[in-house]
Protein backbone atom coordinates (compact mmCIF):
# COMPACT_ATOMS: atom_id res chain seq x y z
CA UNK A 1 0.00 0.00 0.00
CA UNK A 2 1.22 3.52 -0.70
CA UNK A 3 0.95 6.69 1.34
CA UNK A 4 -2.84 6.24 1.56
CA UNK A 5 -4.22 3.88 4.14
CA UNK A 6 -7.06 2.50 2.04
CA UNK A 7 -6.84 1.49 -1.59
CA UNK A 8 -8.61 3.89 -3.90
CA UNK A 9 -9.43 6.53 -1.31
CA UNK A 10 -6.60 8.88 -2.24
CA UNK A 11 -6.62 11.84 -4.57
CA UNK A 12 -4.94 11.52 -7.92
CA UNK A 13 -3.19 13.82 -10.37
CA UNK A 14 -4.48 14.52 -13.87
CA UNK A 15 -2.26 11.89 -15.52
CA UNK A 16 -3.40 9.15 -13.14
CA UNK A 17 -7.02 10.16 -13.72
CA UNK A 18 -6.53 10.00 -17.50
CA UNK A 19 -4.89 6.56 -17.23
CA UNK A 20 -7.78 5.17 -15.18
CA UNK A 21 -10.39 6.65 -17.50
CA UNK A 22 -8.69 5.26 -20.59
CA UNK A 23 -8.44 1.76 -19.13
CA UNK A 24 -12.10 1.80 -18.11
CA UNK A 25 -13.17 2.98 -21.57
CA UNK A 26 -11.10 0.48 -23.54
CA UNK A 27 -12.22 -2.40 -21.35
CA UNK A 28 -15.75 -1.70 -22.58
CA UNK A 29 -15.12 -0.63 -26.18
CA UNK A 30 -12.12 -2.79 -27.17
CA UNK A 31 -12.38 -6.04 -25.19
CA UNK A 32 -10.40 -7.88 -27.89
CA UNK A 33 -7.27 -5.86 -27.08
CA UNK A 34 -7.81 -5.41 -23.34
CA UNK A 35 -5.84 -5.46 -21.03
CA UNK A 36 -3.71 -2.82 -22.77
CA UNK A 37 -0.02 -2.72 -23.52
CA UNK A 38 1.80 0.40 -22.38
CA UNK A 39 1.97 1.70 -25.94
CA UNK A 40 -1.74 1.13 -26.52
CA UNK A 41 -2.55 2.87 -23.25
CA UNK A 42 -0.44 5.90 -24.19
CA UNK A 43 -2.37 6.16 -27.46
CA UNK A 44 -5.66 5.87 -25.57
CA UNK A 45 -4.64 8.59 -23.12
CA UNK A 46 -3.65 10.93 -25.97
CA UNK A 47 -6.77 10.44 -28.11
CA UNK A 48 -8.02 13.63 -29.70
CA UNK A 49 -11.65 12.53 -29.42
CA UNK A 50 -13.67 11.93 -26.25
CA UNK A 51 -10.95 13.59 -24.16
CA UNK A 52 -11.18 16.91 -22.32
CA UNK A 53 -8.56 18.22 -22.27
CA UNK A 54 -6.51 16.56 -25.01
CA UNK A 55 -3.17 15.50 -23.53
CA UNK A 56 0.22 14.55 -24.98
CA UNK A 57 1.65 12.10 -22.46
CA UNK A 58 4.88 10.14 -22.83
CA UNK A 59 5.42 6.46 -22.06
CA UNK A 60 7.44 7.52 -19.04
CA UNK A 61 4.60 9.61 -17.63
CA UNK A 62 2.01 6.89 -18.19
CA UNK A 63 4.32 4.22 -16.79
CA UNK A 64 4.95 6.25 -13.66
CA UNK A 65 1.20 6.76 -13.19
CA UNK A 66 0.57 3.04 -13.63
CA UNK A 67 3.10 2.13 -10.97
CA UNK A 68 1.64 4.65 -8.54
CA UNK A 69 -1.87 3.33 -9.16
CA UNK A 70 -0.69 -0.27 -8.89
CA UNK A 71 0.56 0.55 -5.40
CA UNK A 72 -3.02 1.43 -4.47
CA UNK A 73 -4.53 -1.67 -6.10
CA UNK A 74 -6.18 0.41 -8.82
CA UNK A 75 -4.23 -1.12 -11.71
CA UNK A 76 -2.61 -4.51 -12.20
CA UNK A 77 0.17 -5.69 -14.49
CA UNK A 78 -0.34 -8.91 -16.43
CA UNK A 79 3.01 -10.22 -17.64
CA UNK A 80 2.90 -11.98 -21.01
CA UNK A 81 5.31 -13.80 -23.29
CA UNK A 82 4.99 -11.16 -26.01
CA UNK A 83 4.08 -8.01 -24.08
CA UNK A 84 3.09 -6.93 -20.61
CA UNK A 85 -0.44 -5.58 -20.29
CA UNK A 86 -2.30 -3.41 -17.79
CA UNK A 87 -5.84 -3.62 -16.46
CA UNK A 88 -7.90 -1.38 -14.19
CA UNK A 89 -9.12 -2.49 -10.77
CA UNK A 90 -11.13 0.61 -9.90
CA UNK A 91 -14.37 -1.35 -9.72
CA UNK A 92 -12.91 -3.78 -7.18
CA UNK A 93 -10.98 -1.21 -5.14
CA UNK A 94 -13.95 1.15 -4.85
CA UNK A 95 -16.65 -1.54 -4.91
CA UNK A 96 -18.43 -0.06 -7.93
CA UNK A 97 -21.22 -1.68 -9.91
CA UNK A 98 -20.76 -1.60 -13.72
CA UNK A 99 -22.99 1.46 -14.19
CA UNK A 100 -21.00 3.43 -11.62
CA UNK A 101 -17.69 2.37 -13.15
CA UNK A 102 -18.79 3.66 -16.55
CA UNK A 103 -19.86 7.01 -15.12
CA UNK A 104 -16.61 7.41 -13.21
CA UNK A 105 -14.69 6.56 -16.39
CA UNK A 106 -16.55 9.19 -18.40
CA UNK A 107 -15.95 11.83 -15.74
CA UNK A 108 -12.27 10.83 -15.54
CA UNK A 109 -11.95 11.42 -19.30
CA UNK A 110 -14.09 14.53 -19.82
CA UNK A 111 -14.59 16.24 -16.48
CA UNK A 112 -17.88 17.97 -15.57
CA UNK A 113 -20.84 16.82 -17.69
CA UNK A 114 -24.61 17.09 -17.72
CA UNK A 115 -26.93 14.13 -17.30
CA UNK A 116 -27.81 14.25 -20.99
CA UNK A 117 -24.14 14.34 -21.99
CA UNK A 118 -23.43 11.33 -19.79
CA UNK A 119 -26.40 9.49 -21.31
CA UNK A 120 -25.24 10.18 -24.87
CA UNK A 121 -21.57 9.45 -24.24
CA UNK A 122 -22.23 6.21 -22.39
CA UNK A 123 -24.11 4.54 -25.24
CA UNK A 124 -21.14 2.32 -26.20
CA UNK A 125 -20.23 1.58 -22.60
CA UNK A 126 -23.44 0.78 -20.73
CA UNK A 127 -27.15 0.51 -21.43
CA UNK A 128 -28.80 3.31 -19.45
CA UNK A 129 -32.51 3.69 -20.15
CA UNK A 130 -32.69 7.37 -19.25
CA UNK A 131 -31.11 10.19 -17.27
CA UNK A 132 -32.99 9.16 -14.14
CA UNK A 133 -30.95 5.95 -13.98
CA UNK A 134 -27.77 7.96 -14.35
CA UNK A 135 -28.79 10.43 -11.67
CA UNK A 136 -29.56 7.59 -9.27
CA UNK A 137 -26.09 6.12 -9.70
CA UNK A 138 -24.47 9.55 -9.42
CA UNK A 139 -26.28 10.21 -6.16
CA UNK A 140 -24.87 6.97 -4.79
CA UNK A 141 -21.39 8.05 -5.84
CA UNK A 142 -21.88 11.49 -4.30
CA UNK A 143 -22.96 9.92 -1.00
CA UNK A 144 -19.58 8.17 -0.91
CA UNK A 145 -17.61 11.33 -1.78
CA UNK A 146 -16.63 9.85 -5.14
CA UNK A 147 -18.50 12.43 -7.25
CA UNK A 148 -19.63 16.05 -7.05
CA UNK A 149 -22.82 17.80 -8.12
CA UNK A 150 -22.09 21.19 -9.74
CA UNK A 151 -25.17 23.44 -9.82
CA UNK A 152 -25.73 25.15 -13.15
CA UNK A 153 -24.12 28.52 -13.61
CA UNK A 154 -25.66 31.64 -15.11
CA UNK A 155 -26.29 31.04 -18.80
CA UNK A 156 -26.36 27.26 -18.43
CA UNK A 157 -29.45 25.09 -18.72
CA UNK A 158 -28.38 22.02 -16.74
CA UNK A 159 -26.45 21.01 -13.65
CA UNK A 160 -23.22 19.11 -14.12
CA UNK A 161 -21.46 16.26 -12.36
CA UNK A 162 -17.80 15.38 -12.00
CA UNK A 163 -15.64 12.90 -10.11
CA UNK A 164 -14.15 13.85 -6.74
CA UNK A 165 -10.92 11.85 -6.93
CA UNK A 166 -8.72 14.62 -8.29
CA UNK A 167 -6.50 16.86 -6.23
CA UNK A 168 -8.67 19.15 -4.03
CA UNK A 169 -6.92 22.19 -5.50
CA UNK A 170 -7.85 21.02 -9.01
CA UNK A 171 -11.46 20.54 -7.96
CA UNK A 172 -11.55 24.05 -6.54
CA UNK A 173 -10.09 25.33 -9.82
CA UNK A 174 -12.91 23.60 -11.73
CA UNK A 175 -15.51 25.24 -9.52
CA UNK A 176 -13.84 28.64 -9.84
CA UNK A 177 -13.61 28.32 -13.62
CA UNK A 178 -17.27 27.36 -13.90
CA UNK A 179 -18.28 30.33 -11.77
CA UNK A 180 -16.19 32.67 -13.94
CA UNK A 181 -17.61 31.12 -17.11
CA UNK A 182 -21.14 31.67 -15.89
CA UNK A 183 -20.39 35.27 -15.00
CA UNK A 184 -18.94 35.93 -18.44
CA UNK A 185 -22.10 34.65 -20.12
CA UNK A 186 -24.38 36.74 -17.97
CA UNK A 187 -22.63 39.54 -16.10
CA UNK A 188 -25.82 40.58 -14.38
CA UNK A 189 -26.48 37.15 -12.88
CA UNK A 190 -24.79 35.62 -9.84
CA UNK A 191 -24.55 32.05 -8.60
CA UNK A 192 -26.57 31.19 -5.52
CA UNK A 193 -24.39 31.84 -2.47
CA UNK A 194 -25.98 28.90 -0.70
CA UNK A 195 -24.92 26.55 -3.49
CA UNK A 196 -21.37 27.92 -3.47
CA UNK A 197 -21.16 27.53 0.29
CA UNK A 198 -22.36 23.94 0.01
CA UNK A 199 -19.71 23.15 -2.59
CA UNK A 200 -17.00 24.85 -0.54
CA UNK A 201 -18.05 22.79 2.48
CA UNK A 202 -17.76 19.59 0.45
CA UNK A 203 -14.29 20.62 -0.75
CA UNK A 204 -13.26 21.30 2.84
CA UNK A 205 -14.53 17.87 3.84
CA UNK A 206 -12.58 16.24 1.02
CA UNK A 207 -9.41 18.06 2.05
CA UNK A 208 -9.90 17.01 5.67
CA UNK A 209 -10.41 13.41 4.61
CA UNK A 210 -7.25 13.52 2.49
CA UNK A 211 -5.28 14.93 5.42
CA UNK A 212 -6.49 12.07 7.62
CA UNK A 213 -5.47 9.49 5.00
CA UNK A 214 -2.01 11.03 4.60
CA UNK A 215 -1.61 11.21 8.38
From Swiss-Prot:
Coiled coil: none annotated. Disulfide bonds: none annotated. It comes from the Bacteria. It holds the Pfam family DUF480. InterPro entries: DUF480, WH-like_DNA-bd_sf, WH_DNA-bd_sf. Belongs to the UPF0502 family. This is UPF0502 protein PputGB1_3531.
Amino acid sequence: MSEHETAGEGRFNSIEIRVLGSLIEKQATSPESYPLTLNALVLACNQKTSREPVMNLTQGQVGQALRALEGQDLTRLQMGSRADRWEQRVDKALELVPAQLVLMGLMFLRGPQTLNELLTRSNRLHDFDDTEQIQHQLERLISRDLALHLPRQAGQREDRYTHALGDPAEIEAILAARQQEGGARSSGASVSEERIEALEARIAALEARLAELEG
